[in-house]
Amino acid sequence: MSRAAARFKIPMPETKADFAFPSLRAFSIVVALDMQHGIGDGESIPWRVPEDMTFFKNQTTLLRNKKPPTEKKRNAVVMGRKTWESVPVKFRPLKGRLNIVLSSKATVEELLAPLPEGQRAAAAQDVVVVNGGLAEALRLLARPLYCSSIETAYCVGGAQVYADAMLSPCIEKLQEVYLTRIYATAPACTRFFPFPPENAATAWDLASSQGRRKSEAEGLEFEICKYVPRNHEERQYLELIDRIMKTGIVKEDRTGVGTISLFGAQMRFSLRDNRLPLLTTKRVFWRGVCEELLWFLRGETSAQLLADKDIHIWDGNGSREFLDSRGLTENKEMDLGPVYGFQWRHFGADYKGFEANYDGEGVDQIKLIVETIKTNPNDRRLLVTAWNPCALQKMALPPCHLLAQFYVNTDTSELSCMLYQRSCDMGLGVPFNIASYALLTILIAKATGLRPGELVHTLGDAHVYRNHVDALKAQLERVPHAFPTLIFKEERQYLEDYELTDMEVIDYVPHPAIKMEMAV
């Protein structure tokens, strides 16, 4: 929470919670099909592959950490009524999962009527009937009751539900397709799911395959694959890294590590419908991103405040040794000087150390931006700068991401941001910066009653540190997944008072983290 007095904070409007949740929940598909895209006859599956049934159970039941569901967290399976009825009674509802059945007429009581009477009350806790199609189910799963308690939503059939999944508005929320390909043709099939669909607007990438193997039951050959929609936005980042490493020039730098560098690039990321561009080809430290951005917004300059939260991204630049090397011998250890947050909230004020009270001192650029957006959204001077030439020598590190310009689309009521970053560490810094300015744009949009629009990231000296080359080559081999969603579980009276725990990133399916050393 901000130390500032209330009159110096930015009050949040009554509309602050309007876009706290997405319109529809992201989801995945689990399906098995033969060589003619057949999935069944409407009542049963015309092949026997026990390994696929085991995969289905594990994939839809276990959480992403491969642990079983808990009272607070489980997955959901969405199915049509015929698919529900095709499940043997003894397995209804599917254990350990929230079963969402799409039906215009059935009730929970009717669906559970075939069960022994003594089991119905407990089973009712695991079944929800949605009067509508897949979109209505995803709308329900995007609401507060389920957004945090459901980790992954799986669409499991039948044919009409799969067909709906491949059409708007559902297709925009489809993150993964787990497909078991049966290397045979079942003449009994009367229901089909062509995947990948021909002439589809969405391109699909094969993310993984367990390899073609033979079932121990009937000897059928099968292959379990995972497909993901092509993430063109993350590919911008990967392609830029590849271009830097192939065509950039080798340069020495102040850290002594050395870089491969090129000058001038740009990437664009959509923030619409709660989308958060948190890179997936490696796990990005979201907690660090969020806490640092809130630290900026509060005008704080003590790295110790972050270290106390076990966030050590500024420790190197706040060390006694580093401060002394910058000539900042009078700064207390971990006092970074008038860096980002100070310039955002107190531009031009005389810096007297991180412990001083700066209420009302300098230019509060963030507050000015919020007020101007609300009163004059067409203003072309909606800029925030951290680059103060008069204060650079007092900073532990001059700002790398130094200028943000905001833009209001008055036709769509969307707020977009263009970030200019002079020095761009592609391996460590840039993934952080993308997510950080996405969050800043989302919060400013909340404070001004607008929807988040787009983040445009303009890079000056875009470079790869030489000691990051091998790690980045490994990252380039990975297939990007869909970006996650940011939700707000709690709201605050003032912009500066939002906390990490008020937000949650859901449907984030990244590859493992990749260790890279920070050049100090």
Curated annotation (Swiss-Prot):
InterPro entries: DHFR-like_dom_sf, DHFR-TS, DHFR_CS, DHFR_dom, Thymidate_synth/dCMP_Mease, Thymidate_synth/dCMP_Mease_dom, Thymidate_synth/dCMP_Mease_sf, Thymidylate_synthase. GO terms for molecular function: dihydrofolate reductase activity; thymidylate synthase activity. DUMP binds at residues 254, 401, 421-425, 433, 463-465. The active site is at 400. Its EC number is 1.5.1.3, 2.1.1.45. It holds the Pfam family Thymidylat_synt. Residues 26-229 form the DHFR domain. The keyword Transferase applies. Disulfide bonds: none annotated. Pathway: Cofactor biosynthesis; tetrahydrofolate biosynthesis; 5,6,7,8-tetrahydrofolate from 7,8-dihydrofolate: step 1/1. PANTHER family: THYMIDYLATE SYNTHASE (PTHR11548:SF2), THYMIDYLATE SYNTHASE 1 (PTHR11548). In the N-terminal section; belongs to the dihydrofolate reductase family. NCBIfam families: PRK01827.1-3, thym_sym. This is Bifunctional dihydrofolate reductase-thymidylate synthase. It comes from Leishmania major.
